[in-house]
Amino acid sequence: MDNIEQRVKKIVAEQLGVAEGDIKNESSFVNDLGADSLDTIELVMALEDEFGIEIPDEEAEKITTVQLAIDFAKSKAQG
């Protein structure tokens, strides 16, 4: 597991109150991890803070799984 993946999973665990061990890359924030719309907004804000990036609303709506969050963070970290 690379550093970005670990950081994303740590944020997800903290924001949603779930154990890191229960978080899989394919986990859906809403369907698998029990997030509601406010949770997902707070999650996006935490990711923005952690990685020093801005996630536009139209992009944030597409980030529905842990893997999509990892992929987005990686794309911004490299770009």
Swiss-Prot record:
Pathway: Lipid metabolism; fatty acid biosynthesis. GO terms for molecular function: acyl binding; acyl carrier activity; phosphopantetheine binding. It is found in: Cytoplasm. One of its GO terms (cellular component) is cytosol. Residues 2-77 form the Carrier domain. 4'-phosphopantetheine is transferred from CoA to a specific serine of apo-ACP by AcpS. This modification is essential for activity because fatty acids are bound in thioester linkage to the sulfhydryl of the prosthetic group. Keywords: Cytoplasm, Fatty acid biosynthesis, Fatty acid metabolism, Lipid biosynthesis, Lipid metabolism, Phosphopantetheine, Phosphoprotein. The keyword Cytoplasm applies. The modification O-(pantetheine 4'-phosphoryl)serine is found at residue 37. It holds the Pfam family PP-binding. One of its GO terms (biological process) is lipid A biosynthetic process. NCBIfam families: acyl_carrier, PRK00982.1-2, PRK00982.1-3, PRK00982.1-4, PRK00982.1-5. Belongs to the acyl carrier protein (ACP) family. Carrier of the growing fatty acid chain in fatty acid biosynthesis. HAMAP family: Acyl_carrier. This is Acyl carrier protein. It comes from Polynucleobacter necessarius subsp. necessarius (strain STIR1). The gene is acpP.
